[in-house]
Swiss-Prot record:
Localization per record: Nucleus
Cellular component GO terms held in the UniProt record: cytosol; nucleoplasm; nucleus
Protein name: Cyclin-D-binding Myb-like transcription factor 1
Organism: Homo sapiens
Residue ranges: DNA binding: 306-329
Residue segments, region Required for transcriptional activation: 87-170, 459-760
Cysteine disulfide links: none
Length: 760
């Protein structure tokens, strides 16, 4: 494997052979990527290595295209100290002009949120004076300021919201309360006197700011929607009657006090709507320059009282005046240039160069200075919000990860200019292009322990797949239902699901493969030789291939087996920590040999398995950088025990003892077979975890294959499930799947946009 390390928490995998995850003495997870030493060896010299090979193919011996991306799944034990552990993975496979692009990108980002650990109420006894002060008087504020205290203001970052929600969950759990609204809206001040001070731990904000944030989050009246004309009229009447008694006005309208206050502030009887007239624009410019003592053509973005401006303009609200000036008129008068795609890329790079941990730390005034195509600092920030929205889960990842993802997108576009040309400015796919792009992002969600199914807490798998499919004129369109039989130990296809999870049903051994829609696929694991998947959906070139490995065979066989596939894949192998010595190579990784197959909680005995050897001897092996269709057709019709690939790779790099210091903790394969414990990933309640907790990782990879290399005890390899999405398998000319581009329409000015699946 060859890797490029940008930072300590990111590894971009270029050529994958095998990956090993271990844990050091401090509990940190280490991703070991042995160097591929056989890259330059001609594979033709060693087409038939003397290992027993297991060919993975469908029951009709259907040959799978080289471009088929494959995803391997493995259970990874995490201790209770890893509650903030997050894994984000991104894979992009590109095919243009019927040829596989060699620049296939796989990015693995393993994040340990150290900030959460440092400020956790359980691990930090020192409480910030700021987070324990209400700031009810100016004297309180001045007192803390004179003592050198500083605090954050403005928009809340994702990290701050995560800390706040984590604190609230801990508070509720410690007191046996199910719903936070009981405390916020029903309890008296005496009953909840310690609530806000407790949940403010780790936040460098005054209590009043925390209080207002919590009210906005939990008050449903803040999310009622747009005011109707009838509500506006009633609001005007209530304002005349009750003045600034916002609580009374809000109660009468069924809205929060802050909502009616904001609406009244922007409400004006004489306001025009729609397009501005030339007279209005001229009047706005004159008023702004008059109130700020500036000359026409000067850039004015700060120090403007928009309430005073609106009063002088007379026909527009303060919000309308502010938006018109900052987003258009000031830029037009100062002779600014148009915003281009290069400007968007430059914005990403400039923000990355700032090296800030939070986007709220960005000084937009300095960033916009001297940039002729930037209309105002506020407009530039709005443009940034538009750019980051192209990462579908931008709200769920940290700011540094978001920046790295956007930089990776920039690099992909730079290396593949045709992709940039094929994308329209609005981000809508160009149906005339013959390029197909698949993008998958995977997250790990913890689940509440369900003792009725398993004795160990489980983490379920959720795979949101962002796919835009533009059918060509001759693309097939069938709507027939289909029933697919999955033979254990083989590969089969069924319709791709935008997102799915396994939901236990009332029948033992039966799970419902739930999609985001109302449809579902019943998946039954029984003693019969087959598993039947029924899909009431049209046949599609977008497919998933499932391959199951039984843990029974992993433990009870001693045959040397090299698993070779001509589909790209990665296996992450977990290593028992008590067996890691101070100096160890990959060939010496072992686990406790006392674990027997009986330890598993009723594994399906019908599933055949690929077996991993107690010891594998390595001859001189080679790699062919690319193998053509002739190699595929040569082996595609052979049975399941014959060679499918003509390449072998040997990894020999020693892993230093500093990379492999392990924390003493037990390894229990009995809890590694977790199929029967999978639950809905929508439940993400934090629970006390043990070292036997399971988290499922999915690792997409570029072209390569699995090789059980070096000397690895069979029990150190956990049961696998392989999900392959041969999206480009037989329909490269019939489907066009691309992600969204940076070219999105300019968003409306918004003050509360607090928002990674990179759709490329």
């Amino acid at each position: 494997m060859s890797t490029v390390e940008e930072d300590s928490d990111t590894v971009t995998v270029e050529t994958v052979n095998s990956v090993t995850l271990t844990q050091d003495t401090e509990g940190n997870l280490i991703l070991h990527c042995p160097q591929n030493e056989a890259d330059e060896i001609d594979s033709e010299d060693s087409i038939e290595p003397p290992h027993k090979r297991l060919c993975l193919s469908s029951e009709d011996d259907q040959s799978i295209d080289d471009s088929t991306p494959c995803i391997s799944v493995v259970a990874l034990p995490l201790s209770e100290n890893d509650q903030s552990f997050e894994v984000t993975m991104t894979a992009t496979t590109e095919v243009a002009d019927d040829e596989v692009t060699e620049g296939t990108v796989t990015q693995i980002q393993i994040l340990q949120n150290e900030q959460l650990d440092e400020i956790s109420p359980l691990g930090n006894e020192e409480v910030s004076a700021v987070s324990q002060a209400w700031f009810t008087t100016k004297e309180d504020k001045d007192s803390l300021t004179n003592k050198g205290h500083k605090w954050k203001q403005g928009m809340w970052s994702k990290e701050e919201i995560d800390i706040l929600m984590n604190n609230i969950e801990r508070y509720l759990k410690a007191r046996g309360i199910k719903d936070a609204t009981e405390i916020i809206f029903e309890m008296s001040k005496d009953e909840r006197k310690d609530f806000y001070r407790t949940i403010a731990w780790g936040l460098n904000r005054p209590l009043f700011a925390v209080y207002r944030r919590v009210l906005r989050m939990y008050d449903d009246r803040n999310h009622v929607g747009k005011y109707t004309p009838e509500e506006i009229e009633k609001l005007k009447e209530l304002r005349i009657k009750h003045g600034n008694d916002w609580a009374t006005i809000g109660a009468a309208l069924g809205r929060s006090a802050s909502s009616v206050k904001d609406r009244c502030r922007l409400m004006k009887d004489t306001c025009n709507t729609g397009k501005w007239t030339e007279e209005e624009e001229k009047r706005l410019a004159e008023v702004v320059h008059e109130l700020t003592s500036t000359e026409p053509g000067d850039i004015v973005t700060q120090g403007v009282s928009w309430a005073a401006v609106a009063e002088r303009v007379g026909t527009r609200s303060e919000k309308q005046c502010r938006s018109k000036w900052l987003n258009y008129l000031n830029w037009k008068q100062s002779g600014g240039t148009e915003w281009t795609k290069e400007d968007e890329i430059n914005l990403i790079l400039r923000i990355a160069e700032l090296d800030v941990a939070d986007e709220n730390d960005i000084n937009w005034d300095l960033l916009a200075e001297g940039w002729s195509s930037v209309r105002s600092p506020q407009w530039l920030r709005s443009k940034w919000w538009t750019i980051k929205r192209q990462i579908a889960n931008h709200k769920d990842v940290s700011f540094p990860v978001l920046i790295k993802g956007l930089k990776q997108l920039h690099e992909n576009q730079k290396n593949n200019p045709t992709l940039l040309e094929n994308k329209s400015g609005s981000g809508v796919p160009n149906s005339n292009t013959n390029s197909s792009v698949q993008h998958v992002q995977i997250r790990v969600a913890r689940l509440e322990d369900n003792t009725a199914i398993s004795s160990s807490p489980m983490a379920a798998l959720q795979i949101p797949v962002q796919i835009t499919h533009v059918s060509s004129a001759d693309s097939p369109a069938t709507v027939d239902s289909e029933t697919i039989t999955l033979n254990s130990g083989t590969l089969q296809t069924f319709e791709i699901l935008p997102s799915f999870h396994l939901q236990p049903t009332g029948t033992p051994g039966t799970y419902l493969l739930q999609t985001s829609s109302s449809q579902g696929l019943p998946l039954t694991l029984t003693a019969s030789p087959t598993v039947t998947l029924t899909a009431a959906a049209p046949a599609s070139p977008e497919q998933i291939i499932v391959h199951a490995l039984s843990p029974e065979h992993l433990l009870n066989t001693s045959d040397n087996v090299t698993v070779q596939c001509h589909t790209p894949r990665v296996i992450i192998q977990t290593v028992a920590t008590e067996d890691i010595t101070s100096s160890i190579s990959q060939a010496e990784l072992t686990v406790d040999s006392d674990i027997q197959s009986s330890d598993f909680p009723e594994p399906p005995d019908a599933l055949e398995a690929d077996t991993f050897p107690d010891e594998i001897h390595h001859p001189k092996m080679t790699v062919e950088p690319s193998f053509n269709d002739a190699h595929v057709s040569k082996f595609s019709d052979q049975n399941s025990t014959e060679l499918m690939n003509s390449v072998m790779v040997r990894t020999e790099e020693e892993i230093s003892d500093t990379d492999l210091k392990q924390e003493e903790s037990p390894s229990d394969l009995a809890s590694a077979y977790v199929t029967e414990g999978l639950e809905s990933p929508t439940i993400e309640e934090q629970v006390d975890q043990t070292i036997d907790d399971e988290t499922i990782l999915i690792v997409p990879s570029p072209h390569g294959f699995i090789q059980a290399s070096d000397v690895i005890d069979t029990e150190s390899v956990l049961p696998l499930t392989t999900l392959t999405d041969p999206i480009l398998q037989h329909h490269q000319e019939e489907s066009n799947i691309i992600g969204s581009s940076l070219g999105s329409p300019v968003s409306e000015d918004s003050k509360d946009v607090e928002d990674l699946v990179n759709c490329h």
